């Protein structure tokens, strides 16, 4: 019995990143030697992602309400600089994707269109959807994972309870800590969940289906790597005025790896919040900025929209001037910020961007279908970039504010 306890204690206290790496290796090995067995453990990944998605909405709601209710007077949350970083980072990603697409023009072998997919008719529809998400029924927002609505109601309840008795505030703070403990338990299950996700992905898909789109993937992933390893560190250095790479690699390692395999910014919210606590960031700040980032900080989505749209443009033989390319960057950045308001995310915003160049909806939907084919890598990398950047920019803004306060 004591031996079993010591084994569990070692697992609980061991390096989570190392355990995740072992889970990845085990998943690849199982898929290589026994694909049928690999598919049978897919439920482990589904359970892990399901648990994260289940706990994330209530975590966000309780944390936001508790942090605002317990916020002391004259406490700065640094939200304005974080939002500026989110928006600037998304626009920089779109510009980078345009540059890469011009340097390495890609043509597509188009397939049949994505079935059952309904793209938004324009940017107005995307923004309209986001606006109505704010006034969603709070119970429905929690049930459906509508983080815009959850944030709005959490902020509203927090403000309403700001003048409540200390006992009431203490109850909310205690519930917040309790939910956080549940999140830590779920996150410790990440190695098992990622083992199931990796095994199933390799067994069901492999790399045969995406081998024909190697150049497109190279442009997509190259753009994302440039943002993650060059542009984002430059932005962070500008804010904190020191070597940004230790922080960058911490965020990529502890947030990006999990996000890559869960392929869900919402599911990665608890992971990001735990990382923010580990980095000793201000809870009043990250309890709002992390779920907000999961909604509007979409550098990866901006890259996907831009690269696939320009691939369609090159396929159709359309000439693009600089002004149109800049306009595409703006549209891609704004659309990406609304990607959470569209079923299907960034891929279904491609027809909207394609309409700038007069590309028919039929062709645009074929490009969307290509996106679904390469989605196993594209969506994973996009989510990893989006989610890890949420923590990175939050940490940069908090550190910059602390440095200014000391001056």
Curated annotation (Swiss-Prot):
Keyword annotations: Amino-acid transport, Cell inner membrane, Cell membrane, Membrane, Symport, Transmembrane, Transmembrane helix, Transport
Subcellular location: Cell inner membrane
UniProt key word Cell inner membrane: yes
Topology of this chain in the membrane: Multi-pass membrane protein
Signal peptide: none
Spans through the membrane: 14-34, 48-68, 82-102, 141-161, 192-212, 216-236, 290-310, 322-342, 357-377
Catalytic activity annotation: L-serine(in) + Na(+)(in) = L-serine(out) + Na(+)(out); L-threonine(in) + Na(+)(in) = L-threonine(out) + Na(+)(out)
Pfam families (alphabetical): SDF
Biological process terms in GO annotation: serine transport; threonine transport
A molecular function GO annotation: neutral L-amino acid:sodium symporter activity
GO CC, any one term: plasma membrane
Disulfide bonds: none
PANTHER family, sorted: PROTON/GLUTAMATE-ASPARTATE SYMPORTER (PTHR42865), SERINE_THREONINE TRANSPORTER SSTT (PTHR42865:SF8)
Annotated function: Involved in the import of serine and threonine into the cell, with the concomitant import of sodium (symport system).
Family the UniProt entry places it in: Belongs to the dicarboxylate/amino acid:cation symporter (DAACS) (TC 2.A.23) family.
Matching NCBIfam families: PRK13628.1
Protein name per the record: Serine/threonine transporter SstT
Record organism: Shewanella loihica (strain ATCC BAA-1088 / PV-4)
């Amino acid at each position: 019995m004591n031996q079993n306890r010591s084994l569990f204690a070692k697992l609980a206290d061991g390096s989570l990143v190392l355990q995740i790496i072992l889970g990845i290796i085990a998943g690849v090995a199982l898929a290589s030697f026994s694909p049928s067995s690999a598919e049978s453990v897919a439920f482990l990944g589904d359970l892990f992602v399901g648990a994260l998605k289940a706990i994330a909405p209530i975590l966000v709601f309780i944390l936001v309400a508790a942090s605002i209710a317990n916020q002391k007077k004259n406490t700065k949350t640094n939200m304005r600089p974080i939002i500026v970083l989110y928006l600037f980072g998304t626009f920089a990603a779109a510009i980078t994707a345009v540059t890469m697409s011009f340097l390495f023009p890609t043509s597509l072998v188009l397939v049949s269109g994505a079935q059952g997919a309904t793209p938004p008719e324009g940017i107005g529809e995307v923004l309209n959807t986001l606006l109505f998400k704010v006034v969603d029924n709070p119970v429905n927002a929690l049930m459906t994972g509508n983080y815009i609505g959850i944030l709005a109601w959490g902020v509203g309840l927090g403000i309403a309870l700001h003048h409540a008795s200390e006992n009431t505030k203490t109850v909310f703070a205690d519930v917040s800590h309790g939910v956080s403990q549940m999140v830590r338990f779920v996150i410790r299950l990440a190695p098992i969940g990622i083992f199931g996700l990796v095994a199933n992905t390799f067994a069901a898909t492999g790399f045969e289906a995406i081998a024909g789109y190697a150049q497109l993937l190279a442009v997509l992933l190259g753009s994302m790597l440039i943002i993650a390893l060059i542009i984002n560190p430059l932005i962070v250095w500008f804010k904190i005025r020191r070597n940004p790479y230790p922080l960058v690699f911490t965020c990529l390692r502890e947030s990006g790896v999990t996000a890559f395999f869960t392929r869900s910014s919402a599911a990665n919210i608890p992971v990001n919040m735990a990382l923010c606590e580990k980095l000793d960031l201000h809870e009043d700040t990250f309890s709002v900025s992390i779920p907000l980032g999961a909604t509007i900080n979409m550098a990866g989505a901006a890259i996907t929209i831009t690269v696939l749209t320009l691939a369609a443009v090159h396929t159709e033989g359309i000439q693009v001037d600089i002004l149109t390319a800049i306009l595409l960057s703006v549209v891609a950045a704004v659309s990406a910020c609304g990607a959470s308001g569209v079923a299907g995310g960034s891929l279904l915003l491609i027809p909207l961007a394609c309409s700038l160049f007069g590309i028919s909806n039929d062709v645009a939907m074929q490009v969307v279908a290509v996106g679904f084919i390469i989605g196993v890598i594209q969506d994973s990398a996009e989510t990893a970039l989006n989610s890890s950047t949420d923590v990175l920019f939050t940490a940069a803004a908090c550190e910059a504010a602390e440095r200014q306060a000391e001056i």
